[in-house]
Amino acid sequence: MGKRKANHIISGMNAASAQGQGTGYNEEFANEPLTPAERQNNKKRKKNQ
């Protein structure tokens, strides 16, 4: 099998800039409102980073 290109990298852009901070697991849903449960989890995770 050939090497698969990472999905979150937008072709045509600088590869390095596409992989910086902020390209997290939930990047596609970044502008959706969080549920109260998710907000709690977010706070916990922030502390651990």
Swiss-Prot record:
Locations listed in the record: Spore core
GO biological process: one example: sporulation resulting in formation of a cellular spore
GO cellular component, one term: endospore-forming forespore
The UniProt record lists the keyword Transcription: no
InterPro entries (UniProt xref): SASP_SspO
Main location: other
Keyword Ribonucleoprotein set for record: no
Region (Disordered): 1-49
Taxonomic superkingdom: Bacteria
Induction: Expressed only in the forespore compartment of sporulating cells.
Keyword terms, alphabetized: Sporulation
Recorded family membership: Belongs to the SspO family.
Name used for this protein in its record: Small, acid-soluble spore protein O
